[in-house]
Structures are given as C-alpha cells and as structure tokens.
Amino acid sequence: MPVKRQSKVYYESDSDDDDDEFKELATLRKPISNRDNPLSLQFEIPASVQSVIHKIEESHIFRAKEEVIWRLTEIMSNVELIMTRYNIDSMSPGRKGSSSESQKKKRKAFLEKIATVMTNVDLRERTLSKILSWLEEWNLILSEVSAINMDDYYHWTVKMELIPDTLKRISKNVDSLIQMALLLVEEKKRAKKRILARGTLWKAWKDRAIKRPATAQALRLDQMIFDQIGLNAKVSEIQGMLQELIGTAMFSKLENTAIKYMSTTVINLSKALNTVSDELKLARALGVTLTPEQYKEDRISLTPLQAQVLGITLNLQQAKALGITLTPEQVKAQRVNLIPQQYQVHGTTLTTQQAEAQRTNLTPEQAKALGLPLIPPKPITFTREQTQALGITPTHQPITLTSEQVQALGITPTHQPITLTPEQAQALALILTTEQVKTQRINLSPDQTQALGITPTPQPITFTPEQTQALGITPTPQLITLTPEQAKALANTLTAEQVSLSPQQAEALGITPTPQPTTLTPEQAQALGITPTPQPITLTPEQVQALGITPNRESITLSPEQAQALGITPTPQPTTLTPEQTQALGITPTPQPITLTPEQAQALGITPTPQPITLTPEQTQALGITPTPQPITLTPEQAQALGITPTPQPITLTPEQTQALGITPTPQPITLTPEQAQALGITPTPQPITLTPEQAQALGITPTPQPITLTPEQAQALGITPTPQPITLTPEQTQALGITPTPQPITLTPEQAQALGITPTPQPITLTPEQVQALGITPTPQPITLTPEQAQALGITPTPQPITLTPEQAQALGITPTPQPITLTPEQTQALGITPTPQPITLTPEQAQALGITPTPQPITLTPELVQALGITPTPQPITLTPEQAQALGITPTPQPTTLSPEQAQALGITPTPQPITLTPEQAQALGITPTPQPTTLSPEQAQALGISLIPKQQEISLSPEQAQALGLTLTPQQAQVQKIYLTPQQAQALGITVSPEQAKAKGISLTPEEAHSLGIILTVEQAKAKRINLTPQQAQDLGLTLTPEQAQDLGISLIPKQEISFSPLQAQAMGLTLTPQQAQVQKIYLTPQQAQALGITVSPEQAKGISLTPEEAHSLGIILTVEQAKAQRINLTPQQAQDLGLTLTPEQAQDLGISLIPKQQEISFSPLQAQAMGLTLTPQQAQVQKIYLTPQQAQALGITVSPEQAKGISLTPEEAHSLGIILTVEQAKAQRINLTPQQAQDLGITLTPEQAQDLGISLIPKQQEISFSPLQAQAMGLTLTPQQAQVQKIYLTPQQAQALGITVSPEQAKGISLTPEEAHSLGIALTVEQAKAQRINLTPQQAQDLGLTLTPEQAQDLGIASTLKQAEAVGIIPTPTPEPYQERRLSLTSEQVQALRTSFPTKETLSLGIYLTPKQAQYLGITLTASQAKVMKICLTPEQAQALGITVTPKQAKARRTSLTPEQAQALGVILTPEQAQAHRITVTPEQAQALGIALTPEQAHALGIALTPEQAQAQDKPWTPTPVSSTREAKMIVSPTDQHPEDGYVVDVEAQRKNLVTLNQAAQTSALPAQYLTIAKNLIIELLHIDTVRLGYLSRKYVAYRLIQLARNHLTKRVKTIQNTGKGYEVQSLYTMLDRIDQYQKKVMHSWTDKQKQLEQRRKQCLRSMTQFFSQLERGYKLSLSQPMPSIPSFKKIPGFTKLQRPVLELLIDDSKRSDLFKTLGQASVEAVWNADLSTSSYPIIEKAPMSALWAQLGGYPDIPKLLQLDIQSTFRKSLASIRSQSKKIRK
C-alpha cells in the first residue's frame, strides 16, 4: 500500500528527496519475489501487467517532479511579489493601499489554487492506491495457485486480451439499439401528433357547421357570378382549410404539392368568375349586340372575355387585326408563348416577377420537336483580335474627352445639352417634351411603369456558382461566341442560336480568343491584401422604401438653344471625337470589343450555340414534368401582406416555410438529369468535356495559353507600367470631396484624380500570351474544354451526369463568381435602423457598403504547413483533452488529467466539463451570483459568539424511543428505528412533558425568560450566566429567579429593589415553607420582599441591609431603610421618599446619597433627650442614634417652634419659611443659594437692596425695585419694624406695600422706580413721557391710549412706538404726513390708553403666538425678560394677553406659529377659524363650539376634525353625507371631543409615529438643536411606552390562556359530574363538587392577580402618556420640534353616524325574552365593564368599515377588534355576552 505524506506544509523538499521517497514507495509496492518468499511457487507475471505497473510508477515519479517544480515556481513568484511590494512601498507610498488589496487578492487566489491542488492530489493518491491494492491482491491470488496448466493460462490470457474489444463492440451495439429506440419513439410521437392534428383540423369550420349549418353550404352558380364578396370569402376559407392540411404534417411533399395545386386552381377560378361577372355587368350596361365585322369597322377594342361573351372567337391574328389587347393570363390561356418583343407588340406589360420567373430549359431540338417557337438568336460579341482574324471591319467607337483635354488640343467643342433638375425646370416654367420626359432617367417601380404605359425591357437573370450548383445547372465553360453570319461564313453547321467554340476549334478556325481576366472573390482579395474599389449600389424601389431613403429626382436635359435662351451657362462636358477626328489629331483610340448580330454571324458562317428553351408552367404540366419545389423569394409587398416584416432585401423562404405560411410558390424551372430526360423522351444537348492539363498532355492535346492577370504589385515588380484607368465617383463621394456633380456619375482621368488628391485603386493588368512569353512568366496551366465531337474523336467517353465545378475551377475557367452576401446580427441591423426578421439578415457586399457597414474580417485558420511556410512561430499552447476525446483519437491518456485554471481554459477557448464549482461568498458576490441560502448549523457557543439568539426551534429535547413510549407518545415506524427523538420545548410543553433544568442545561437550550416561564422551566442562575442572558428585574421576578447581588452583577442585572432575601433550607422549613426537591438541595433559598411579606415573614434589619429596596417597598414591608443601606446600594432618593421612609439625613449624608439639598431634605436636628423632653415617642433605633432629624413640616405638626439659629442651617422654600413662622434673612438665602422671585421675597417679608438682589440672582424688574425709607422715617410713618429691620440702615417697600400702608409716593421717589403702566395707575402715579423715556419703555399706541398719554410724533419715536396708519387713526393719533407710504408713524398715547395696559405676560406662553414686543415695551409693561429673549429682542404674547391688550390675532399668525387655540380662545380673540385651519392646528371642535364660532362644517370636515354629528345635524347640512373609507390608521380612529373625554380614558399610540420620533430626536441631537438631557428623557419615554404596550398585550394573552386552561379543567369535571349523575353514584359527585369549588376559588384568585397586574401597568402607562404629552408640548414650544403625540382613544364601542335607512332588517338574537330575569335586564342596560381597555395601535390591524356579516354587527359599527372580544365577562357564557352586547346596541340606537 502507498505511504501517504505526513505533512502537507513543507513544500520546500528537494527533488532528489522526492525521487528517493517515490523509489521507496515503488519498492514497497513491488510484489514479494521468489527470493524473499521461498515458499511461493514459480509464477510468471504477464507482460501487460508488468507494463501497467511500470507505467504507474513512471507517472507517479513524473507527477512528483512536476509538483516539486510547481512548488519551486510558486516560491519564486512569492519572493518576487514580496520584492516588488517593498519596491512599490518605497517608491510610491500612496499606492500602498492598492498594492495591499492586490496582494490580498493574489493571496486568496494562491490559497484557492493550493486547495484545488491538494484535493486533486488526494483523489489521485486514492485512485492509485486502489489500483495498486487491486494488483497486489491479484498477484497474491495468482501466486497461491498450486498447479497451473500453461495451455489454459495462455488460452485465458488471449481471452482476456479480447475482452476490451468485446466490450467496445457491445457498447457500439447498445448505442445502435439506443438510436433505433429513439427513432421508434420519434416515429410514435409523429404518429401521435398526426392523430392529435386530425382532431384539431378545421375546428372553426366544424363548430360553425354545427351551430349554423346554412353557412357550411356551397355557393350556387348565380351567387358565384354575382356575389363577389361571398365568393372571395369562400375562396379564402377553402384556401385556409387547405393550408391547415399542409400544416398538419400528415402528408408527404408530393401530396402537399397536390393540395397547393388545388388551392391555386380555386383562386384562379375565383378570379375568373370575378372577371366574368365584371364583363356581364359591362355587357348589360351596353345592351348592344355587334358582330365582329361591326367591331372591326367601328374600331372597337374588345377583351377576349368581351368577345367570348358576345360569341366571338378570335385568334391572335384576329385579335391583332381587331385591336384587341390580350392580357398575359389570356395569352397563357391560349397557350401562346410570347417573347418580350411580342409582348411589346401586343401591348402587354410584363411585371418584374414575370420577367424573373424561372422556367424550364429545353434545347432547340426539344423545342422544335415539341413545336415550340424559338426566340431569335442574340448578338455575338467579338474582341479586336477576333474581328481582325475573321476579317470584320469594326465600327469605330466615339472617344470621350474631358473639357481640359479638349482645351489642350484646341478643339472647339459642340454645345452639349444642359441637364436641369425637375425643380429647376419647374422654376423656369419649362414645358417638357415627351423625349425630355423619357430621358429623365427616373427609376419607376413595375406598378408605376404599368400605370404610365411604359413597357420595361426584360432583364436577364444572373446566377452565382453556388446558386447554379444548388439548382443543378451545369455552367457552360468560357467559349468563343460567333454570330450566325460568322458561323455561316466559316461553313460550320450550327443551330439557330449562338455557337460556342472550344479553344481548339477556335484555333483550328484561326480565331484567337480574347484573354479573360482573373476574378478574385472578396475573401481571396482580402487574404492577398487587395482593397476592392467600392462600386455604386442600385436599390429597387421596395428596398428604397423599406430603408426609408428618399431617392434623388433625376435631372432634365435642355438643348443648347434652350439653355442660351434661358441665360444658363452650361457646364463644359467632355468632348466626343469621331474616329476621323482622332486620327487627324494623332490620338490612338482604345480598341473596343465588336458585337455581331445573328445575321452578320450567319454571313460569316458562324453557328451559334443552341440556347435552352424556357417552358411555362402550363407547358411543363402538359408534358407531364413535375417541377421540384424551390425556395421561394418574396417581395416586400408579399411579405407585408402575409404579416412578415420584410428586410430591405427580398426574403428567401424554404419550401417548409412557404407551406407553413400557406403561400403558393411560383413554379420554378426544372433541371433534369440525363436519366430523367431520357425517360421523358427528351434528348439533351451534348455538353463539352473539361480536361485537366495533365489529361490534355496525356492525350496529346496542346491547350491554348490563357491570359494572365497580374496585380499592380506584381506588374510593378516585373517593370510593367499599367495603363491608368479612369475613376468613377458616386454622387455621394463627389459631394464629400467638394465637387459639384451633375446628376450622373463623374468620370475622372488619372490626372484629374491625382489633382484632386484621390488615390485610384490599382487595377489588375491583363497580359496576352505573347506578353507573358516575352516577360518570361510561366502561366498556370488551365484545364482544356473539349466539345463532345472532339471527345468522341479522341476516344473519350463523357459521363452523362451534369458536371459540377468548384469555385476554384470556375475561377480558373474565368467565371466571375458573385461576391458572398454579408450576414448581419440583429444588433447591427437595429443600429442601422433595419427591422430584422428573427433570423439574421443577409446583405450583399454592395448593400453593406451602401449602408456604411464594414464587414468584420473573419479569422484565418492556417495549417501547420502554411504557418511554417510563412515563417510564423506559433505560441506553444498546452492542449487538454477529456478522456472521451483522447479515446476517440486513439490516444492513451495518462491516468490523471491535466488541470487548467478557469483563466487558462478561457484563454485556450476550451469549454470545461460542467463540474460543480465551489465559490466562496466573496467570489460569488464579485461575480454577481446570488447563492442559495443553505441552512447553517451552529453550536450554542458559535451562536453566542456571533450574537445569535437561539430560539427554541433550533435547540430541541432528545428522547429515546423507550422514553417516548413511556410518556405515551405514538411513534412512526421511522421514529421507532432511530436512536433519539428530538422535540422542541414547545412540542414538549404541548405533549405535557416537563423539561427539567438539567435537560435544559445539558441540551444547551437558550430560552428567553418569557419562553422559560411559559414552558414551566425554572431557569437557574447558572443557565442564565452560561447563556449570557441579560434579565431585567421584572423578568427575573416573573421567572422566579432569586439572585444574590454577586449573581446579579455577573448576569449584568443592575441591582434595583427587586433583589431578594436569602434563607437556608432549614430556616425555610422552620418558617413553615414547603420546598421543592430542587430548593431543598440548594444552600440558600431567596425570597423577594413581596414573597416574604405574603408569607408573613418578618425581615430583620440585618437581612434588610443586603437588600436593595425602593422606598415604597421598604415602607410597605415595615423595613427601616438606613442611610448606610441607601449609600451601599447606591439608591437615589427623592426628598419625598426619604421623608416617607423616616430617614433623617445630614447635609453630608444627603450629598453622599446624591440628594439635592432643597428645603425638604434638610431637617432640624434634636438629641434623643431633647426629643423626649418635647414629648416625642422614639423608636429603639432612634433612641440609639445621637441626633434625631425632623423636617420643618414634622416640627410644625408636632408643635415645635424652630429658633432662628436652627433655621439658619435649613434650606427652606419661602412658602415653608412663611408657614413655619421663620423669618428668612438675606444671609440665609445667599448661603443656601436660594433664588427668590420678587413675590416670594415680598411674602417672606425680606427687604432687599439692589446689591443683595443682585447677589441672590434676582432680576431687578419693576416689582423688585422698591421705595427706600430709613428706620426713623418708617417709625414716623407708623410702621412696626422687626428687630432685624430696626438694625438695617434702610427699609425697602414695594409700591404695593407703600399703597397698602397708605404711604404716598412722591414723584421724585417714583422717578427711580421702574413701574409698569398698571402699577403706576394703581399707585396713583401719573406716568409722564419723561419717565417712560428714562425707563426705556416701548409703548404700543393702544397702551399709550389706555394710559392717557398724549404723544407727539417725536415723543412716540423716542418711546419706540411704531404703528401703522390704521392703528394711529384708531387710537386717535394724528400722524404727520410723509411721502413714504409705508413709513412707520409716530403715535401719542393718552393716560387712559396707558391705564388699559395693566397686564403681566408670561413669556414662555407667548412664544407660540408670534406677537412680539420690543424689550422697552416689555419693560414698560412689567414683563420679565430672560437673557435669550433679550437677545432675540422680541417678546411673545399668549392669545389671552393679546386679547387683554386689544391686539387682534390674524389666522395667518396663528397658522405660522402653530398656535393651538381652544375654541373659546379663538372666539374671545375674534379669530374666525375655517375647518381647514382647525384641522391644520389640531383643534378639536364640538358641534356647539363650531356653531358658536360660525363654522359651517360638512360631514367630511366634521369627520376629519373628529366631530360626531347627530342624524339631525347631518340632515340639516345642504349636502348629503356618505361615509367614506379612510386609509390611514390615525384618520380611521374617531377622535372624541374634550367634553366627552374622561380622565380614565386612554390614548391611541401610533407605533410607527413614535419610531419616527426617535429618528427625529436623533437628527435634532446631531444638529445640536436639542440638549442631551432632553434627548435622553424623550427617548426613555418613547421606549418605555412601547415596552408597556408590548407587556400589557402579553398580560392580556396570558390572562386569557390561564382562563381557558382553568375552564377546560372545569368543563371536564362538569362532564364527569353529569356522567356520574346518570349512574347514580352520589358519593363521587360530592368530591367532584368540592374540586369544582376549589377550581372556582383558584380561578378568582388567578384572575384577580392578573387584574391587579393590569391595573398597575395601566397606571404606569397613563403616567407615561401624561409625561410624554406635556414634555412633547414643551419641546414643540421651546425648540420648534414637532413630535407625534398620543391621540385620545375612542370609547368602548365605535361611534358611527346613525343611518336613516338600513339596507337589511335587524336580526334579533335567538333569546327568549320570557327566560330573561329582571336582574339581567337591568344589568344589561349598564355599560359592560371592560376587562381590558384596548387602545389600538398601528401594530393591531384596524377594522375599516366594510360590508357587515349580519345586521347586528352592522348596527354596532362592524366587528370589534380582537382585544374587544376579550372584554366580555369571562364568568358568563357566550350567549349572555351577546345578550349584553345587544342591550348595549339598543342603548346606542336610543
């Protein structure tokens, strides 16, 4: 067995060590030899086995070497990367980040490669180890054989060698069977399709025939003639039915052809009938019968149908004599074969389709035998040498000279006609002649030519070699063409058509053939580097229309006289010279080829080659020839009619496509093989035989040398100067070059092209054989073509099959192939604006060039020989073959395939076998692959480390099958076989299985406290600590966890007063407590103070020391909380809590406990003796302490008088000092840092100097600046002074005190006092303008008027009074007129106006309204300014203050400042509120308030404002009210007016809005618009409210669950009682009744406890809501922070408007009134006390009004929400609950 490497880390092992290692492995793998094992028998290992072992060992060594080399390469690359990294870091520090990222990517790729290599190595080692183990076992088995028969051994060896071949043959046979089976299955599928297709055949016609049998009847004869519409409908229907037959694939191609024949015949019959009907109508309209002679005499032209209707039978001569024009259909009907000239003579117009229709080719002999007329022979073209050889004098062709050449030769050119465009002709008002119109060269479509009466010349059809090969046409090789006259002159017997001579015949006759130029295909030209000259492209009208090209209108030709008369200067045209002029000027003309007419050819004795004869489809049908269906080419019009989007080129359809589309193809010409022609009796024309040069040389035939075409480069290399050819430019090219062309293409000479900077494309040079021989060029031998006679003379038997030439042979023979079409992808066609069909669009090179498309050069594939010949060194690429490819190529692959990385495979273009690829999440994300989420299994530790909370579904309880059966579980057979059964905690709870803490701990179940409590699991402290569960004190209490302070600290519980008292189990038993087995085993038992109080356990002071209790709990438990306990537990006590607990604190203790020492926390100290002397009863604890502290209130209640010395150490509020009779001195206020308001200082009798007021932080406003008197003056005035006042130098009195004492304030004293207008008025002080100016009081005009101040404009300006013109006029101030219309006026106030301004204004409330006063005005009015208000320089007034001042508040001001006005405030202020303003300002208006404010509300506005209208109010509205559904939750809730609101009513909390509030608060904190402490308070309020809502829903659910569980047990007992009563066993009933009584008591106790919890939670919620409402309102006023506040909730049932008419009658509940008790009726009238006041939130889905299920619920306003159902009395049955609801509904209706 192979030895695996122990380490995969040390990759740096040397190759020698690896070689030694693998040599040792090889020795270990060798079988035990005979020397080592002398007991083994003599046995010879087969050579094949030895070779396999040898190859395995060699491959192993080879792979080991490769691995070592690869590792060394990786090490070197890593070293280079490290070096480059440090170089990069030292050279450019800025690129450090990118380099590190690249290093990370490379490192990741390197690690992935290592992982791939290791997996592959492991697989290889496993495979090799299996093979080697198999070989070793085989060797041992063979070595154990005792005796071997060598003959049998060799026999079986041969058989084993044959086994692979046998297996291969079996595999091939299996493959063939699979193919046969597939063919059979496909055949069955086809048969099935045929059966199915037959069932769906003619479905529409069958249905119509069943429903309306009359429509399935055939037309009558008269209907066919006169009803054209019906006839066309029937014909289209029959054609569609036939097309369905073709599309079913039930018929063969020949049968489909027959069906098409029937369809075509039906269509032709319909057309014929239509024509007959038209002619009948014409004959009836004429009503005149003429004889043929009359028609001839009157020269009346009749159609054949008209003649047939009149009974006249005409032939062609008669029709011509009578002037009757025959249509092509009529000519075909008479079986007349007309040539284009005959068509023109008869006036018949051929369409383009008719001209291009392919026809059957017959030889002249066949046509003569069939009696068919022959087309006259075509003219024959000769070259100059042929005409010289034949002695023919050619007619000299005219030579075209340019204007420069004419001018250079001094020739006076004849005036040429001038060409004008149609627009120019129209602008010059020329009347064109018929010849000028014809010479405009306008391209017309066939329809336009037919409409204009123009007969087009039929164009010949050109086929490419590929098309001829596809059509089976044998092209005639390049021969010499003679006219019949020339053939006759040469005395050769030829047919009536043109004659083709082979090169040998031409040489024998003395005719030298013209050398043919060689034509290259575009691919060959591209391969040779030749750029072809772009040729102009001609488009058909359909192509132009499809491409959206606007054709240029052709120009008009004018004669020189017309041009001169119009004053037009013609452009100089090239001059044409006659041969005589050229000879006179010494110009040598270029020889032109000579064209001979058939007569000239016949005169010269030349016999033309017979041409094939074209048969019409009727002739081929008459001869019984079946044409092969050819692909059909559709014109754009036909394609558009069939619903096909045509491409610019005609669309080529296969026969299958034409069958599928129901198109009848035009009969195509038929090509017959010699056998078919012989079978039909047709003698084919013998074809010439083509010989290769070798065959010709073998037969002794000397071929005529062919001319050679040289490229310009070759010609330049041989020193031949080619004749420069003229360049032809298209109009577009001339326009691009700035040349003004005539409408025709311009021909430039080489000199002109060179002058314009145009580089002409070099043209190939054609050399004659003589020139080739003179230049010493060896021409390529061309194949020789022999005529049948020459072949017969030489003894060569031609093959009767048609001869097919390859493109190379055609090129060698001088045949010019058509350039290959270009295929465009849909993207390219879309970019060019071409609408493609789903298939790629094929364009010819000319079309592609016209559209500006450059064809993509295709890659050239070179063979190794060509690569070597061209001197190209190919890059050696590693080739990877799959085992199948290697086996197909016969290559024996190495047992391990070579692994390529994806990049290498992509670079080599290899498509990898689709193996599953494993990607890391980063790779998947980089590739944009979304991985399928796989379930991940985590251990509890991993989940804890990842921060995942394991829910009970992920951690289950395991039971053995025996345990499950013992518990009464029914197991499935699969569960019974497994070792363990896993249950979730919920499943265990549902099955009644109790999960012990040990199971919960052992199984690692992470449960939330609520889940543990619901499952009945007692969560131990160790579990909570191990699972890192953070418990709140409430959760710990609910779960029954008793924690020590240390355990609580470990669990992260902040020790709040819900920590418990510890007892040992013995102490607990002594107290009478019943312990569980688990509690009996623990060392200590922990009880909460509440549990201890419920059990009647008295907590000792020592036990209380270790407990953190709230003051309320300590007070309720009777525990005296000491200062040390409060300090040790870090309890922050409020003064009220310290007072309630009886804690007496010194200032130091208060400071240590974090209590702010305000007067309620600093008390009066007494020693125990003093306290006993005062008659105080002391507790033992108080008797032990040194001092007893009493609050001032306690001292006052006990009747203890506080001396001034004791009062000095007490921080009292002014009210407390006043109530205790303590005179608070200024020093006490200063020492205690008490900020006193002026009112408090006055109440306490403290007189302050301005300096003292400044030290105490009192802002000296007019109420604090008082009148000073000396003690003597005060005694003289009759004032009684206290001893403290007698000692001071001055006594200060406020103006009010002075007024109360009857002291008159002199004006001098009043000058130093800052008084408000009200104070001055009450004191009897007349406020002068100087005082107002000295005090810097800014008065409004109204205040000045109320104070009775008469102000001049200057005084008003000094006082800062700014008023508008209207205000001045209202107050009575006459303003000084100024030019500025908007300038502020100066006002004068009277004493009455000043007196009316007696109002004090709180500043914070005025901020919401936006009524601003300047600081001077505020100081004058007695308003206290804060520092921030003084900075803003504006003061805000509340609506009440504005009303008292007579200031009118506009609705805009109220809207701009978001003032929330009550209806009373709005009415008092005179603000008229619209319903929109009321809704925008969140003002809730009752109907009475709306009526008092004069607001007319529509029902929609009332619904939006939360006003519930009565039916009478709703009917009083002008517009009928219809309730509309509301989308939002807040609008769906009906808001109750404040008058209907009760203090105990709740609020609706919008959860989403509160979450948005949190976001808003965070944003405000980021912008520093809100202080941190306010942010914390607001967040805590929101979080607490949301938590309370969640908890109370949980309370409700648990309460209901507990109730249902108790009811289930009670129902079970009730059933047992009924069952026992039937049996008569009374003693059992008594025990059951006892159990029922206990259950009822227990139910009351449980329900009472839950109700108490709900009440406590509801109190917390109401307190939180009130705090939130007040705090949010303060934030909105103070910081302009708009937060969503809780809304008042709806009453117990939804209030909806009463309906005047009900859609359905009210269904009474099925309750007998006689069975109801009077007590129940009286109780039913009262409102149902809700178990739960369910306030809806966003989390509970609101029930929007919809169609009610019953009239009762409709009367109640729809079904209530789920918590409403739980409000029903839980003690009553469901019928009783419904009865109470019904009584409530009656109350609502009343």
Curated annotation (Swiss-Prot):
Pfam families: FAM186A-B_C, FAM186A-B_N, FAM186A_PQQAQ
Family membership: Belongs to the FAM186 family.
Protein name (database record): Protein FAM186A
Source organism of this protein record: Mus musculus
